[in-house]
Amino acid sequence: MKKQNKLAIFLVCATFVSCTTPQQNSQWKLTWEENFNDGKLDTTIWSTIPRGGGWAAYLADYPELYQFTDSTIQLMAIKNTNHPEDTARYLTGGIWTRYKKEFKFGRIEVRARLKSANGYWPAIWMCPDPIPYPYGGEIDIMEHLNHDDNVYQTSHSYYTINLQKNDPPKYATAPINKNDYNIYAVEMYPDSLVYYTNGVRSICYPKVNGGKDGQFPFAYDPFHLRIDSQLGGSWVGPIDPEQLPVYMEIDWVRYYEKQ
């Protein structure tokens, strides 16, 4: 019993340290960035996300879903009016770095502007390969629903999804400048994930017990980045086609590592 009490005290103290010690900006060095300045995807880094079930039900690689400006990419969500051979009623765009670029420990930042519509669900998130979901974990840097004035930032795993545990708390909401660009970030450490919106920390998710199948699987495998527009689902609710098209516009993505 005494050993168990000591272990519990140690874990509480470790959690307190990892989630309360501020990280100085001077500790980070920018090691990679994507500015979307070329008017096309850098296919050495990015691929369009293929269609699948659930969240990927409307994803496609049609060019009109990927609109480039001089220095941004817009990932569209539209009604399907031009592709009669495609039975999907709606179409969305999404990109990822899967099998091309991975990230492990460090800070990811994404500067993005979001349009709003009922049933619209843009997301910036990370998953590992080739770990079966949800054992390797899922890092949701940003999810936005409908016309909300806030975003969700969440740590998912077998512990939170299958076991339905929320201790420590797995998510927080953060206010955004709804009609402007916002910067979403996560810092990945061996013992915690720390989320930010516009430089303000929203939540720290600490490691309480280890193991790939445990509460904190995020320290074991590198993650790839996913940025996509999604439509519909039980969480976001029904789609209003009259509010389409909408999009998520990405200005840049940056990756920092400790100096």
Segments from the language model and where they lie:
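Bacterial Sec-dependent N-terminal signal peptides
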Residues: M1-N25
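GH16 jelly-roll
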Residues: T20-Q259
